[in-house]
């Protein structure tokens, strides 16, 4: 590290030069202002200054750290009148962190010092008492000795004075001495006993007091620590927002996340390096030697962030991606993979794991698991509906089904007294028509389905949404493929079947034959003991149409059809399309409740508020009850036909459910594609190059898109594959043209047209655009286009045969075969075969063909010629030369 002079160091730390030189001198280093100061001398000076200020340990570790933070942000909130205003948001935070280890050490050290002091005082008092006892015993002994000496002197004096009474005085004196000794001994023993008891009592009191003080100190510390822990948890869990505005709170949280994310990315520099730089980096100066980091010394603060992983609630759905699970647990995905490997399961970061496995992993890592059903939100939204009204009788929903051109729409046309059939392209129905009619005996709702083979999905939807199926069978045609399919749909849906035998006015009509054919498919007439009603009608002349209506109403009475007439409505999407002027339009058949203008409707992956409602005649209406078909406007997109339409309370929740359904549909679609890729991997590896016909399909309604797409995909073969790169409802736009150009596709429009910008883009890119109004023509032309993409088939056709009569040698060409043409025609430059005993021995081509000395292009049957075979000289007499040509055969799709 670069050494600084004394003057430069004083400028960095903000201390006068003279003052710094005095401090260096006190530390034992005499320096001038121009002298250099090394890192060791700086360390020595710092230690000296700390000792001067009373820090004996030579280090100063902060025990309390206070962090203050202030963030400013600008928030745009909505104001009155559709305007917005900017609000300055300032968030101030102050947090104090206490080093718990320091508090615990101080408390423990204080308790130990107090106990040590008490023990020292107790030992001191015991020593003083012992000294007092020894002094008393010594005084007693001295007193006893003095008394004894005095007694001896007195006795000697008395013996001298009174010789006569010596014996008597001696006896009395001995008795007195004995009594005095006994009494003194008793007093000394009593005094010693009292002193020992007093010392023991005081020692016990002091020990009890010391124990009580230690207990109180421990309780106070425990209470203080628990209170600090509680406050810390409350601070962490409390809502620290300084405003009640939702927008301000969101802005504050975003600012916090940004700051905390930036703080985590910054590297913490060692304290020694910071100290030696004198705070240059804090003031914005450029530091040197960024690549070399000094080792941390004791000057680094002792506050360390806890490395313990926070335990939290982990919400797990039915399936979850491993990386998402790791993100919810705030750990790296590699840690989750390690835990799974310990549990005996191998996984990758993008692998989808089930709910049970994810629960085991999360619990293994110490988190609390909250299991959530995937359709929990959907169930909550659909259950929050007012559907407790009383059920009342409703009109039957009748679906007209049958083979194409058997008179379904004509029958319905006669009932409605309109001319719907003439409006359909080619006289065939290509959409589901929903109508309700009033009869003398009540209302009936009719669904008219297409009979063409391509509209299988439409017929299936019609059968699912219906109460009664009317099967129209032409008396002259009998049972046809779509007739059988309609029977299967009706049986699968579990709805009763009424057979309408149409076209009985024709001469070749044979109703009995129809009954016999239908009996093979378990459709037995009532007169034969079955359950199906047969009605003979003529849609053209209107024969027995009333009888058909009576049969329908009779069947509906038997079914006892009821529905809730009031409350929030629910129904099914019969058809949908994209109208250029009105947006997404859906035909909905209301099945229960009342659909009102302004209701919030959830249709599959789409949602919206009903802006307008129209009946089948195009009239504006405000409400629709059960069994009434209506067109609704206002959805977010074009729903799929067959989706359930439900009125909900909250538009926000409806949007969430729709988005969830869209995400789920995408997951299922991707999973299906992945499965298809895995299943077809081997076949794709073994198969050769496959021609691909890319198609951009646009139609007027959703049902037609589905039907055409399904029919086109069924045309795919092993050699030519149809790929629908784009499809949708509505007119052809410039986006469709760009997509077709990028994918080298053709554009097929079914009952739709391209706008001006799309036409310009199509002409500029030379994209093939075709319009259709009848599905027959569309499918036939796509078949022809696919046939043109098939690899051609080549066939070898023999055009002539020549017999070798002689062989000549030519200096230029080698062996020349003199031949007689026995069959067909010999042409020059055609491929040939040389046959010997009817076995091919060489295959090549003609190099020279001459008649006499002239080169000719061909030689006919019965003429002689000379033939030179290219690169072959082993021609012998008797060989046959076979001339053939390769013919290309055009292939078509069967």
UniProtKB/Swiss-Prot annotation:
Record-annotated tr-type G domain positions: 393-562
Residue ranges of the region described as Disordered: 25-304
The organism's place on the tree of life at top rank: Bacteria
Region (G1): 402-409
Pfam families given in the database record: EF-G_D2, GTP_EFTU, GTP_EFTU_D2, IF-2, IF2_assoc, IF2_N
Cellular component terms per the entry's GO annotation: cytosol
Compositionally biased residues, Basic and acidic residues: 33-44, 52-62, 101-174, 184-239, 247-263
Subcellular location(s) of the protein: Cytoplasm
Matching PROSITE patterns: G_TR_2, IF2
Positions that bind GTP: 402-409, 448-452, 502-505
Region (G4): 502-505
Keywords: Cytoplasm, GTP-binding, Initiation factor, Nucleotide-binding, Protein biosynthesis
Annotated segments matching region G3: 448-451
InterPro entries the UniProt entry points to: DNA-bd_dom_put_sf, EF-G-like_DII, EFTu-like_2, IF2_assoc_dom_bac, IF2_II, IF2_N, P-loop_NTPase, Small_GTP-bd
Region called G5, residue ranges: 538-540
Comp. bias regions, Basic residues: 283-293
PANTHER family: TR-TYPE G DOMAIN-CONTAINING PROTEIN, TRANSLATION INITIATION FACTOR IF-2-RELATED
Family: Belongs to the TRAFAC class translation factor GTPase superfamily. Classic translation factor GTPase family. IF-2 subfamily.
Physiological role: One of the essential components for the initiation of protein synthesis. Protects formylmethionyl-tRNA from spontaneous hydrolysis and promotes its binding to the 30S ribosomal subunits. Also involved in the hydrolysis of GTP during the formation of the 70S ribosomal complex.
This protein's name: Translation initiation factor IF-2
Lineage: Bacteria, Pseudomonadati, Pseudomonadota, Gammaproteobacteria, Vibrionales
Name of the encoding gene: infB
């Amino acid at each position: 590290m670069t050494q600084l002079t004394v003057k430069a160091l004083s400028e960095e730390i903000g201390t006068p030069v003279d003052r710094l030189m005095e401090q260096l001198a006190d530390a034992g280093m005499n320096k001038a202002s121009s002298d250099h100061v090394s890192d060791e001398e700086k360390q020595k000076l710092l230690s000296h200054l700390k000792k001067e200020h009373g820090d004996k340990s030579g280090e100063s570790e902060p025990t309390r750290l206070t962090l203050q933070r202030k963030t400013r942000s600008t928030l745009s909130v909505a104001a009155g009148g559709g305007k917005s205003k900017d609000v300055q948001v300032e968030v101030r935070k102050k947090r104090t962190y206490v080093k718990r280890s320091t508090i615990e050490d101080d408390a423990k050290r204080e308790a130990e010092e107090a106990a040590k002091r008490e023990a020292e005082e107790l030992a001191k008092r015991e020593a003083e008492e012992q000294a007092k006892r020894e002094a008393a015993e010594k005084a007693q002994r001295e007193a006893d000795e003095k008394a004894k000496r005095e007694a001896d002197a007195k006795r000697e004096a008395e013996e001298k004075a009174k010789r006569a009474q010596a014996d008597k005085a001696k006896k009395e004196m001995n008795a007195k001495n004995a009594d005095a000794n006994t009494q003194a001994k008793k007093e000394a023993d009593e005094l010693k006993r009292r002193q020992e008891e007093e010392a023991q009592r005081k020692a016990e009191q002091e020990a009890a007091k010391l124990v009580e003080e230690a207990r109180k100190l421990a309780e106070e510390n425990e209470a203080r620590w628990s209170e600090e822990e509680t406050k810390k948890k409350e601070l962490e869990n409390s809502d620290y927002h300084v405003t009640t505005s939702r927008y301000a709170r969101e802005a504050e949280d975003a600012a916090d996340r940004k700051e905390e994310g930036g703080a985590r990315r910054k590297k913490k520099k060692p304290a020694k390096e910071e100290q030696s730089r004198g705070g240059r980096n804090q003031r914005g100066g450029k530091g040197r030697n960024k690549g070399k980091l000094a080792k941390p010394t004791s000057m680094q603060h002792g506050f360390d962030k806890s490395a313990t992983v926070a335990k939290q609630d982990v919400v797990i759905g039915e399936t979850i991606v491993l990386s998402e699970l790791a993100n919810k647990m705030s750990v790296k995905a590699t840690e989750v993979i390690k835990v799974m490997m310990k549990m005996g399961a191998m996984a990758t970061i993008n692998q989808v794991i089930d709910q049970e496995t994810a629960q085991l992993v999360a619990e293994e890592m110490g988190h609390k698991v909250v299991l959530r059903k995937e359709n929990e939100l959907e169930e909550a939204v659909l259950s929050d509906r007012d559907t407790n009204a009383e059920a009342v009788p409703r009109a039957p929903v009748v679906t007209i089904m049958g083979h194409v051109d058997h008179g379904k729409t004509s029958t319905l046309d006669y009932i409605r007294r309109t001319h719907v059939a003439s409006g359909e392209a080619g006289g065939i129905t290509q959409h589901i028509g929903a109508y309700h009619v009033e009869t003398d005996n009540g209302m009936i709702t009719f669904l008219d389905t297409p009979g063409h083979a391509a509209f299988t999905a439409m017929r299936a939807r019609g059968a699912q949404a219906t109460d009664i199926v009317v099967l129209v069978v032409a008396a002259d045609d009998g049972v046809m493929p779509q007739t059988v399919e309609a029977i299967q749909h009706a049986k699968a849906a579990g709805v009763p079947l009424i057979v309408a035998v149409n076209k009985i006015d024709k001469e070749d009509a044979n109703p009995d034959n129809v009954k016999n054919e239908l009996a093979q498919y378990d459709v037995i007439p009532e007169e034969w003991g079955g359950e199906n009603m047969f009605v003979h009608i003529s849609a053209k002349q209107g024969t027995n149409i009333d009888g058909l209506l009576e049969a329908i109403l009779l069947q509906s009475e038997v079914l006892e059809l009821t529905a809730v007439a009031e409350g929030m409505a629910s129904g099914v999407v019969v058809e949908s399309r994209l109208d250029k002027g009105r947006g997404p339009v859906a035909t909905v058949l209301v099945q229960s409740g009342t659909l009102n203008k302004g209701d919030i409707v959830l249709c599959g992956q789409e949602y919206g508020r009903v802006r307008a409602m129209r009946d089948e005649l195009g009239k504006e209406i405000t409400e629709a009850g059960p069994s009434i078909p209506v067109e609704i406007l206002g959805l977010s997109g074009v729903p799929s036909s067959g989706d359930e339409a439900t009125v909900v309370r909250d538009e926000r929740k409806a949007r969430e459910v729709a988005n969830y359904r869209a995400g789920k549909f995408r997951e299922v679609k991707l999973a299906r594609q992945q499965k298809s890729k895995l299943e077809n991997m081997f076949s794709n590896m073994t198969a050769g190059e496959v021609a691909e016909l890319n198609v951009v399909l646009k139609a007027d309604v959703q049902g037609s898109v589905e039907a055409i797409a399904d029919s086109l995909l069924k045309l795919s073969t092993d050699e030519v594959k149809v790929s629908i790169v784009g499809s949708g409802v509505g007119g052809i736009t410039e986006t469709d043209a760009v997509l077709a150009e990028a994918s080298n596709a053709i554009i097929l429009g079914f009952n739709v047209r391209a706008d001006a910008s799309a036409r310009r883009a199509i002409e500029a890119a030379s994209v093939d655009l075709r319009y259709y109004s009848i599905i027959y023509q569309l499918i036939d032309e796509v078949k022809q286009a696919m046939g043109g993409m098939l690899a051609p088939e080549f066939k070898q056709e023999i055009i002539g045969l020549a017999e070798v009569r002689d062989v000549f040698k030519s200096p230029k060409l080698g062996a020349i075969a003199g031949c007689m043409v026995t069959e067909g025609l010999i042409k020059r430059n055609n491929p040939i075969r040389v046959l010997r005993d009817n076995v091919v021995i060489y295959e090549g081509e003609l190099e020279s063909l001459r008649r006499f000395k002239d080169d000719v292009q061909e030689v006919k049957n019965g003429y002689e010629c000379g033939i030179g075979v290219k690169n072959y000289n082993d021609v012998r007499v008797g060989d046959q030369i076979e001339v053939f040509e390769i013919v290309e055969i055009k292939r078509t799709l069967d």
